Regions:
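Ferredoxin-like iron-sulfur electron-transfer modules
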Residues: 84
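Jelly-roll (double-stranded beta-helix
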Residues: 1-81, 92-307
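N-terminal extracellular ligand-recognition/capping segment immediately after the signal peptide
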Residues: 87-91
Length: 307
């Protein structure tokens, strides 16, 4: 449970971020699936899952193609460097990444019975080909589906396979309910600078309970910690997270103290340098954080996941 220097880690695996998917898992053994995705990555497939996805663009810009509801025309959501975006559950989406760009994507572990889908559309936005699968590591699971589609009659003819065959679109799509509200990406650096200019420090919800509507309906809870000018080194109260806790030190330095539930001591302190990330396991720990003056850290949990 030590911090990982994110930029150093990305440089160490950059050569592995290659088509057709370009994913590399940073954390994946527990509740959060945290991955880094590199370009070029221009895809024709659309991914669908039953949970939300958290996008944060680290290097360069990307575009996220989405289908807001069944039969609707595709839309483009630009996500620029430094911006964060939460994609609502069940929305078909196709990430488009240019060469030299790097982004960070977080998904939750799948609940019992949940299935992911990978699909391709015809020009009239009806489904041409679809496969469903139990998802553990997208970086490994998408490639064989893409290869099967590329070798399929559906790709050659532009007609979907008959019902019952591999790739046949389902007759009733429970993965795709009515379109949820979409919230535009947030530029984190701009948001933090604006918060400081208005004297907002401490803990502020960005998504989830306590966040401005409609971001308050998110299943993710994403909280910003900003260090105050006059309270450097002040610790927050001890909190028991609702599950795995992910921390990303965006600007300057901070620290996190971790102790087992039931202990009364100060816990074990870990320094968070700029661009460090840390994953605290679920269930047995309490945490508190401290930010130096003007520092900015993101805290991510997903209360929907049961411990």
């Amino acid at each position: 449970m030590n911090p990982t220097p994110l930029k150093v880690w990305i440089d160490s695996i950059r050569s592995l971020l290659c088509p057709p998917v370009g994913n590399k898992l940073l954390f994946g053994a527990g509740q959060h699936k945290v991955m880094v995705v590199g370009g070029p990555n221009v895809r024709t497939d659309y991914h669908v899952e039953a949970g939300e996805e958290f996008f944060l663009q680290l290097e360069g810009d990307m575009e996220l193609l989405i289908i807001p509801r069944a039969g609707a025309e595709g839309l483009v959501i630009p996500i620029r460097e430094g911006e964060a975006f939460i994609l609502p559950a069940h929305v078909p989406h196709s990430p488009q990444r240019r060469a030299g760009t790097v982004g960070f994507v977080m998904e939750r572990e799948r609940l019992p019975g949940e299935m992911d889908a990978l699909r391709w559309y015809r020009p009239n936005w009806t489904v041409l080909y679809e496969e469903r699968f139990a998802c553990v590591d997208l970086g490994k699971e998408l490639r064989p589906v893409i290869e099967r589609f590329n070798a399929s009659e559906a790709k050659r003819t532009g007609e979907p396979p008959p019902l019952g065959e591999v790739g046949a679109p389902p007759s009733n799509d429970e993965l795709e309910p009515d379109a949820p509200p979409f919230v535009q990406p947030i530029n984190l650096r701009t948001w933090a600078a604006d918060a400081r200019s208005r004297g907002i420090t401490g803990t502020t919800p960005l998504w989830g309970p306590g966040a401005p509507a409609p971001r308050d309906t998110s299943e993710y809870s994403i909280i910003a910690h900003i260090g105050a000018e006059n309270s450097e080194g002040k610790w927050s109260a001890w909190v028991k997270p609702p599950g795995e806790l992910f921390l990303y030190q965006r600007e300057l330095w901070g620290a996190v103290a971790v102790r087992r539930v039931g202990d009364s001591g100060d816990g074990e302190e870990r320094v968070l340098k700029e661009n460090d990330v840390l994953l605290v396991p679920a269930g047995a720990f309490e945490v508190r954080v401290s930010m130096e003056a003007n520092a900015f850290c993101l805290e991510v949990t997903n209360p929907r996941i049961k411990q």
